[in-house]
Structure formats: structure tokens, C-alpha cells
Amino acid sequence: MPSRLDARATRHYFDSAFHCPAVKVLPNEYYVAAGEDIMISTVLGSCVAACIRDPRAGVGGMNHFMLPEGDGDSPSSATMRYGAFAMEVLINELLKAGAARERLEAKVFGGGAVLSAMQQMNIGERNARFVLNYLNTEGIPVLAQDLGDVHARRIGYFPRDGRVMVRRLAPHHHKAEVLIAQREQVAAQTASAKAHTPPQIERFSAPAKPRFERFTRPSTATS
């Protein structure tokens, strides 16, 4: 099972549009910045990203999860692909970096149905509903949200001041990024299907009854 350190985003680059250092968060990853002048970016399809910060401490971060919750009894549910685990990891890492729980505030994005053939799965809708319910339960106010619909999104989050730049991606203008979001949704569908498929059990038929060779009664000797 991957550790939290393994799930921390490591793809740093310089964003020429915003003229600042940036880090790209992929599905099942997170990133936390404490006082850094950095942009945290991601591309979302049916996945959801929660951007959470403590404005007083200047500590903020983002996660990117594929599904709301796993089977609590399964070790595989404790991975960043599931929202329940991804939210816990992000909040705990923020607190470790100096944030105070009572000052946390959130902005949430994603949950789109970017592939019409998969809209019946409602993965994006389930993710969106999950993140809002989770934050409400934890008492973390949601200051902004852009959830649902049929668009892929590119998110740029500036944890130092809380700004978020959202671009809805039109397929004919942003083919590469929309393709990423579509692949993400296919992966989420596959993971969801596997999570709800019961383990296959090989059934053994009852052992065949042993065959006995029956001996006929010896015939009576005749004189």
C-alpha cells in the first residue's frame, strides 16, 4: 500500500501563464504548501479536488480523488483514490504544517460527467455529494464550488492567498487536457466496478460416490 509520502505530488514546473512556480497534482495525489508562492494545478473529469487552507497561517493544499469511499473492511480502501482517505490525509498534513482545524476553509471542484456513455455511473455526482457532506460533517466551511455538469476542468490554486483559477475545457479547444480527464473517468469507472465486484469463489462439487464392483453369487456346481 502506498504511504502518504508516496502520494505527495512531485511534478514541479514553471507556469508561463501565471509566471510562477507550480506543482501538478495527479489522481490519487495531494500537495501542501506552507508560505510558498506556488500554484497547485490539476485537471479534473469525474474526480474531485478539495482546496483547503488556513488563511491566518498561510498553509494550504489540494488533493485529487477518484471515488467517494471504499469498503471500510478492505485494506485497499485506505488509499488516496478514495475521498474518505484523501480528505483525512490532506487535513492531517495541513495540521502538521501549522494550520489550525478551526480556521480551515475549503473550495471544491470537479465531479463532471465528461463521457456521456458513463453518465449513468454517476461517479462525478457521487464524488461531489461526498465532498460536500464530508466538509459539512467536519465543520469546514465551503467558500466556493464548481461541481458537476459535463465539463472537464483545469484548476490553478494559490494556497498563499486562497485564489483559485478555474477553466472549463471545451473538447475542441483543449483536446489534450480533455483526453486526460476522460482517461481519468474511465479509470474511476474501472476502479468502482472492481470495488463492487464480489470475490469469485470456486465451488467444489460433491465428490463422486466410489464405484463398487459387484460380484454375482457364484453359481452352484452341477454334477
UniProtKB/Swiss-Prot annotation:
Region Disordered, annotated ranges: 189-223
EC id: 3.5.1.44
Pfam families linked to this entry: CheD
Any one Gene Ontology BP term: chemotaxis
Catalytic activity: L-glutaminyl-[protein] + H2O = L-glutamyl-[protein] + NH4(+)
Manganese found in the keyword field: no
SUPFAM superfamilies: CNF1/YfiH-like putative cysteine hydrolases (SSF64438)
Transmembrane segments: none
Record key words, sorted: Chemotaxis, Hydrolase
A single GO molecular function term of this UniProt record: protein-glutamine glutaminase activity
Cystine crosslinks: none
Signal peptide: none
Similarity comment: family membership: Belongs to the CheD family.
PANTHER family: CHEMORECEPTOR GLUTAMINE DEAMIDASE CHED-RELATED
Role according to the record: Probably deamidates glutamine residues to glutamate on methyl-accepting chemotaxis receptors (MCPs), playing an important role in chemotaxis.
Protein name: Probable chemoreceptor glutamine deamidase CheD
